[in-house]
């Protein structure tokens, strides 16, 4: 376990300060892009709406299981073979874990929304936020754009960093690859619309299971980070709002980090939203909080995000050092 902790510590630091070099992914496809292509291939082949709901559910289930198993096998092959490469193998594993984390890329995309709002106004903000959310930004005002960016930041703190780190510690590269495939499948086919309701049902449920613990860990880390960086009362408020409102969210997991951020920042988040032609109703998290968010609130959310990531990284580094000393 201490080896995994050391690898994860270095990967978290590398991802934070270097991130994903765009020049690299212009030349070779990102692993998540390859996952997406495999899912898209299977969806086009087996999601035939002339089939019955039960057959579509079965097709989606077997596609997801098959791709997850392929990821597990690939992860096992790499995990068993890389040690034979010595230092180069260790460096390769650190780099693999790094590219499957998303601290810097997530923060950069969210920061771009605040920058666009300040420099280009509402139209620029809408364009920037459309890069990170699935909802229709066309009718969002400044508050709606800002809340959407903050909600995406909170949810993806779990999905993009805490969950991959968790599953790497639990299952090594096989666990990390499997999680990223599951999460990618959910983002592509796990929607409650006519096209994906049946075919993507299994992927959506599996993603709920995979994110159950990481989402709650993220909310707890955000609450602790609020207490450390602001004050104890603010941290208690973040934790209290999370415990009270997390289950109000339509997602069984996203509500935990989002409500912790809402409480820690004093904002009202979530509520009704538009996905294309589909309007999804929902209650506000921390309904008594500020609703007319702006670019300054995005900056505050980014500060909380980085504080949360620093806390997690510090805990991982501390655990790795303890493991080395005890070992």
Curated annotation (Swiss-Prot):
One Pfam family, short name: CobD_Cbib
Recorded GO CC terms: plasma membrane
GO molecular function per UniProt: ABC-type vitamin B12 transporter activity; threonine-phosphate decarboxylase activity
Pathway noted in the entry: Cofactor biosynthesis; adenosylcobalamin biosynthesis
Protein's UniProt keywords contain Aminoacyl-tRNA synthetase: no
Residues annotated as transmembrane: 60-80, 82-102, 159-179, 304-324
Topology versus the membrane: Multi-pass membrane protein
InterPro entries: Cobalamin_biosynth_CobD/CbiB
Localization of this protein: Cell membrane
Similarity remark: Belongs to the CobD/CbiB family.
NCBIfam families membership: cobal_cbiB (TIGR00380)
Role summary: Converts cobyric acid to cobinamide by the addition of aminopropanol on the F carboxylic group.
Protein name: Cobalamin biosynthesis protein CobD
Native source organism of the sequence: Brucella anthropi (strain ATCC 49188 / DSM 6882 / CCUG 24695 / JCM 21032 / LMG 3331 / NBRC 15819 / NCTC 12168 / Alc 37)
Lineage: Bacteria, Pseudomonadati, Pseudomonadota, Alphaproteobacteria, Hyphomicrobiales
């Amino acid at each position: 376990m201490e080896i995994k902790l050391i690898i994860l510590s270095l990967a978290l630091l590398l991802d934070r300060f270097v991130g994903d070099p765009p020049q690299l992914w212009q030349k070779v496809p990102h692993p998540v892009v390859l996952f997406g292509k495999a899912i898209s291939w299977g969806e086009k082949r087996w999601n035939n709406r002339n089939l019955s709901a039960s057959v579509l559910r079965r097709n989606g289930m077997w596609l997801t299981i098959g791709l997850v198993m392929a990821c597990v096998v690939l992860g096992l092959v790499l995990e068993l073979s890389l040690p034979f490469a010595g230092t180069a193998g260790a460096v390769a594993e650190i780099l693999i874990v790094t590219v499957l984390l998303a601290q810097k890329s997530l923060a950069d995309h969210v920061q771009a929304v605040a920058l666009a709002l300040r420099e280009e106004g509402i139209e620029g903000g809408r364009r920037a936020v459309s890069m990170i959310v699935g909802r229709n930004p066309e009718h969002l005002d400044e508050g709606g754009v800002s809340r959407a960016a903050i909600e995406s930041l909170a949810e993806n703190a779990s999905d993009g960093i805490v969950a991959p780190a968790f599953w790497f510690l639990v299952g090594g590269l096989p666990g990390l690859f499997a999680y990223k495939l599951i999460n990618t499948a959910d983002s592509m086919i796990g929607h409650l619309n006519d096209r994906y309701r049946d075919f993507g049902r299994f992927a959506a449920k599996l993603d709920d299971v995979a994110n159950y613990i990481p989402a709650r860990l993220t909310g707890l880390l955000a609450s602790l980070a609020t207490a450390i960086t602001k004050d104890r009362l603010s941290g208690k408020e973040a934790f209290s709002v999370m415990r009270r409102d997390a289950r109000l969210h339509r997602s069984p997991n996203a509500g935990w980090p989002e409500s912790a951020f809402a409480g820690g920042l004093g904002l009202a988040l979530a509520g009704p939203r538009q996905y294309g032609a589909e309007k999804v109703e929902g209650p506000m998290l921390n309904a008594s909080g500020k609703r007319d968010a702006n670019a300054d609130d995005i900056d505050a959310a980014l500060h909380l995000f980085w504080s949360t990531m620093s806390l997690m990284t510090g805990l991982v580094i501390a655990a790795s050092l303890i493991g080395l000393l005890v070992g």
